[in-house]
């Protein structure tokens, strides 16, 4: 009874909103609520993670060397795996890739558990020291909220995808208090088509997320940036150098991530993965405590110049007093952070690479400035180079230069740094993109053919379900049929095209009635000629596994108006008409181009 009553209210609400407000106003109103829910989820997760870390650090002995670091990560990964496998019973993934796949494969539809499952799993992983970030799980959470709200209101695929993007925008805006960057993220990373109809809902969600974050978390930012120094033209060569360096470190990041994922993938037993990953991660964190968790506290130590604090709980603390040893440890942190991140996710932890890219970039930028100052006698501003390094690695790993530029510019309130950020991000991107075609989020999707593209033509050809326009009504006849039997088929058919099947019901050839008119009217040949003698072999087939691009290329190459569709085993499926293909393609483009 209650369920029916609630369903009736929902139906009435949907009808009222669409009739009284119109679809555009409905989307704007829903984007506001998505902004509230997405931002609230991000705020809750941030607080839960900090509470978990505070509980662990305050409950257990605070010795000079904290050996509990050996145990925390493995406990976190075990709890995460139990939660995902026993409670959620579904693959949660690490966030952005799942969102991208849903946009491309399922019209922006995400499962309802994604509204909370990533929140819990990422809190367990990161709170217990997993060397990953919360941002990607929050993107998935916000996106799932938008997607499921769209489902509730029976919105079409285009508007579902838009509300999905609004959810991710709200979550990112709430985390960093950076609304412009959050919108750029939705466009550049989630590959949302920017239209006038899409921009306003994104603005509403981004603004709502930022305001809520300011309301509940105050003006404090994730990164404690006191002040930046003005941009000095003479430092451009160092920013160029930093761009090149962050570019190659981004390539290392992507390839090391891929390599470690591959190694863990070969391990079939989840218990062995957890054991190896947990022990390895714990040992790395014990030696280099800066690897614990997201790493924003370590970045803040760099920004304040308190580098020694990074090694306070490490067995290596005494060695860090020597400046050259400090450099060595900082370089180790840059390279080992990537390994720690890959091990965390590969062993079963849930988290993203957003925070790790900022971490690696910050340490890279600090090293460039410190080496130039200490050994070469320059006076480079550490803070500026830390920020530029963060933008450089993020740009290279995510292949998202605009997102990285606007993030650092907004969180540092330093648009005076725009030129250095642009130089570093662009050069890093240019170093990576010729070598690594896909970003950390899109590689696996591209390998499986699930990747959306900003090229509308290619997107349409991949997205459209061509099976629905296959013509299954072409008459088939056996290969040993006589001309007499062929004429009987002709009398019953409205088509002038026929398919010939062999003894095993496999595709053998085609019969075009116009090619045989002289024989059809010659009754003396009726029992002498077989269709085997008359049929032709098409010069080209469309296979059921062909992509939209391959199919269209075959039509253009052969100049045929109709082509048979078969399997690689020559099982006959039907016919595709070039006219229907182009008509469906035009309708799809028109639907996705409307404002």
Task: Give residue ranges: language-model regions.
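Short beta-strands and strand-coil junctions in structured, solvent-facing domains, enriched
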Residues: 507, 561-562, 572
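Alpha-helical transmembrane segments and immediately membrane-proximal extracytoplasmic
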Residues: 1-463, 467-473, 477-498, 502-508, ...
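The conserved cystathionine-beta-synthase
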Residues: 477-495, 500-501, 520-523, 527, ...
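Structural signal for short hydrophobic segments within the conserved structured cores
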Residues: 473-478, 533, 538-541
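C-terminal hydrophobic structural anchor segments
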Residues: 381-384, 532-536
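Short aromatic/basic micro-patch
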Residues: 460-463, 510, 528, 575
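Short hydrophobic beta-strand motif reused across regulatory alpha/beta modules
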Residues: 509-516, 574-582
């Amino acid at each position: 009874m209650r369920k029916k009553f609630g369903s009736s209210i929902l139906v009435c609400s949907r009808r009222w909103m669409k009739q009284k407000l119109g679809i555009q106003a409905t989307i704007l109103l829903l984007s506001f609520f998505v902004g509230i829910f997405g931002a609230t989820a991000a705020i809750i997760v941030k607080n839960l993670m900090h509470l978990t870390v505070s509980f662990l650090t305050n409950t257990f002995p605070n010795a000079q060397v904290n050996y509990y670091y050996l145990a925390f990560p493995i406990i976190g990964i075990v709890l995460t795996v139990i939660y995902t496998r026993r409670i959620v019973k579904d693959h949660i993934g690490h966030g952005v890739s799942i969102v991208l796949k849903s946009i491309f494969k399922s019209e922006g539809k995400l499962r309802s558990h994604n509204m909370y499952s990533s929140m819990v799993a990422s809190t367990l992983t990161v709170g217990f020291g997993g060397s990953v970030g919360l941002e990607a799980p929050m993107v998935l959470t916000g996106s799932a909220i938008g997607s499921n709200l769209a489902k509730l209101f029976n919105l079409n695929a285009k508007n579902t995808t838009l509300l999905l993007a609004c959810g991710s925008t709200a979550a990112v805006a709430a985390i960093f208090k950076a609304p412009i960057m959050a919108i750029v993220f939705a466009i550049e990373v989630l590959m949302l088509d920017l239209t006038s109809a899409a921009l306003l809902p994104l603005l509403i969600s981004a603004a709502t997320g930022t305001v809520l974050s300011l309301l509940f978390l105050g003006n404090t930012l994730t990164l404690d940036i006191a002040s930046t120094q003005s941009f000095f033209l003479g430092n451009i060569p160092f920013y160029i150098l930093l761009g090149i360096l962050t570019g190659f470190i981004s390539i290392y990041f992507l390839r090391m991530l891929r390599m470690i994922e591959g190694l863990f993938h070969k391990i079939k037993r989840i218990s062995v993965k957890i054991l190896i990953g947990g022990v390895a991660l714990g040992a790395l964190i014990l030696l280099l405590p800066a690897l614990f968790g997201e790493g924003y506290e370590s970045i803040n130590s760099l920004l304040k110049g308190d580098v020694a604090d990074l090694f306070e709980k490490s067995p290596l603390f005494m060695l860090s007093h020597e400046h050259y040893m400090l450099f060595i440890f900082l370089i180790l942190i840059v390279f080992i952070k990537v390994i720690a991140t890959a091990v965390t996710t590969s062993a079963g932890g849930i988290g993203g690479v957003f925070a790790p890219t900022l971490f690696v970039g910050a340490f890279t930028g600090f090293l460039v400035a410190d080496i130039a100052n200490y050994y070469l006698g320059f006076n480079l501003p550490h803070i500026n180079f830390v920020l530029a390094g963060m933008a450089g690695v993020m740009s290279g790993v995510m292949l998202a230069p605009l997102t990285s530029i606007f993030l650092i510019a907004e969180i540092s309130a330093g648009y005076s740094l725009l030129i250095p950020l642009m130089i570093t991000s662009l050069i890093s991107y240019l170093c990576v993109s010729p070598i690594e075609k896909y970003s950390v989020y899109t590689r696996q999707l591209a390998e499986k053919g699930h990747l959306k593209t900003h090229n509308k033509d290619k997107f349409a050809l991949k997205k459209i379900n061509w099976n629905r326009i296959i013509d299954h009504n072409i008459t088939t006849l056996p290969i040993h049929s006589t001309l007499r039997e062929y004429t009987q088929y002709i009398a019953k058919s409205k088509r002038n095209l026929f398919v010939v099947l062999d003894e095993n019901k496999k595709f053998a050839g085609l019969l075009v009635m116009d090619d045989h008119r002289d024989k059809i009217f010659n009754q003396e040949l009726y029992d002498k000629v077989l269709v085997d003698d008359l049929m032709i072999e098409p010069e080209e087939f469309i296979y059921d596994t062909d992509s939209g691009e391959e199919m269209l290329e075959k039509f253009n190459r052969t100049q045929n108006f109709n082509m048979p569709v078969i399997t690689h085993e020559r099982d006959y499926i039907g016919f595709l008409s070039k006219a229907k293909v182009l008509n469906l393609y035009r309708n799809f483009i028109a639907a996705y181009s409307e404002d």
